[in-house]
Every structure is written in C-alpha cells, then in structure tokens.
C-alpha cells in the first residue's frame, strides 16, 4: 500500500468512538494501520491531525485527516461504496437511522457515563433516567425497524455499529460497577440486537478485553469518586 492510499486510524483501545470506526473498517474489509494514542499525553501528530478538538478518533486517508466518529463513518461509506452500505438508500429510512444514532449519541451515552462516576442516590437517579431513555430507544427500534434480522455482516449498518459500540460491553459494565442498565426485561429488542451482533465474527475481532476493561472502569470510578469526596 503506497503512502497516498494508506488508511490509518488514530484511537484508543477502550474508546467507544474509536470502536465505531474499527467496526466499519473491518465490515468493509478495508486494510488499515492502527495507532494507539495516549490521551493523557497527546502527541504532536494527533494535535496536528485534529487541531480543533485534539481528540480521537482520526482517520487518515490519502494523507488527509477526517475527525469525529460519525463524520468518519459516513466518509468511509461514501468512499468505499461496497457492501455493507452503512446507510439505506431510501431517504426516509436513512433519516430514521440518523435520528436514532443522534438520540443514542446525545441522550443515552451521556447519562450512561454519569452512572459510572456516581454512587448512592445520585447514581440510582441516573440509572432510572438511563433506563427510561433506553425504553424510548426500544420503542423506536420496534416501530421503525420491526423486521430487522441480524445474521451476517451485510445486515449491519450505521445504527447497528453505534448500538454494538455503545452497549456491546454492557455486561462488563455491570460487573465493574454493579449496575445493570441494559435490562432484557425492559428492552428486549435492544438486548436481542446486541446479542445477535455479538455473534458475528467481525464483532469478536474488535471485542474489548474483559479483565482490562473491568480494571479500567473501576480505576476511573474510584479516582472520580475520590476527587469528588475531596472537593
């Protein structure tokens, strides 16, 4: 692969946002180089590639950087127009996918992050809020994607990528912080999508190492709680 056509992903191993891009690249069968970034000690290279946000992920293609995970995913789909296509051809279906992706990004991810760093009454309140928002997502999946079948890579699109990257490690989160957010009784459709997606070989290739993730979550949680106690 010459330097001009080379594809490089700058990310971090535990990042949901990086994981989204990894999944898309593997689904499309795109060869790429992965660069692990240390966000506590950002490299000059990362800052130059993403001078506005100075964050990962950044995809470099044809020596040109593309930042922000959702922007990168659409760039991948438009540049490599081979199966699976990440967005449907029908404008209304495409709008629905983008709406629910936005909902997860803006309404669900934030409250789930709060749960990790809270305890007691504050955490219980956030857990309830997270479950309520997931129930809205559940109803949306049943209404707009009632016949969804997930058996192979071609059944995976943008929404499925966001779901598995966001919720794929929910059992590990349960183990690490002792709270179950994705409840099969409350959100059976969402739970089923996650289970089916996890069975695909491509998802197993990008699965986060359980022990390492548990240790990271518990470490972050304890550090945050200690800082809050000392504030």
Predicted stretch roles:
Residues 63, 182-184:
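Conserved, non-catalytic sequence blocks in retroelement Pol enzymes and Pol-derived host proteins
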Residues 100-103, 115, 164, 209-213:
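Short acidic/histidine-centered micro-motifs embedded in hydrophobic/aromatic stretches
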Residues 211-231:
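C-terminal helix/juxtamembrane-tail motif
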């Amino acid at each position: 692969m010459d330097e001009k056509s080379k594809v490089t992903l700058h990310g971090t191993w535990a990042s949901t946002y990086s994981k989204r891009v990894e999944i898309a690249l593997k689904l499309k069968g795109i060869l790429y180089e992965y660069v692990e970034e240390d966000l506590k000690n950002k490299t000059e290279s990362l800052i130059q590639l993403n001078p506005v946000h100075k964050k990962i992920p950044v995809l470099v293609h044809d020596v040109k950087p593309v930042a922000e995970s959702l922007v990168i995913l659409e760039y991948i789909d438009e540049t490599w127009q081979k199966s699976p296509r990440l967005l449907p051809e029908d404008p209304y279906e495409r709008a629905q996918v983008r709406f629910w992706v936005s909902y997860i990004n803006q309404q669900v991810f934030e409250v789930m992050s709060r749960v990790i760093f809270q305890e007691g009454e504050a955490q219980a309140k956030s857990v309830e809020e997270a479950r309520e928002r997931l129930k809205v997502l559940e109803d949306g999946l049943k209404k707009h994607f009632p016949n969804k079948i997930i058996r192979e890579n071609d059944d995976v699109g943008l929404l499925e990528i966001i779901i598995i990257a966001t919720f794929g490690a929910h059992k590990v989160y349960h183990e690490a912080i002792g709270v179950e957010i994705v409840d099969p009784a409350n959100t059976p459709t969402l739970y089923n999508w996650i289970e089916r997606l996890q069975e695909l070989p491509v998802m197993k290739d990008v699965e986060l190492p359980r022990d390492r993730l548990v240790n990271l979550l518990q470490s972050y949680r304890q550090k945050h709680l200690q800082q809050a106690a000392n504030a």
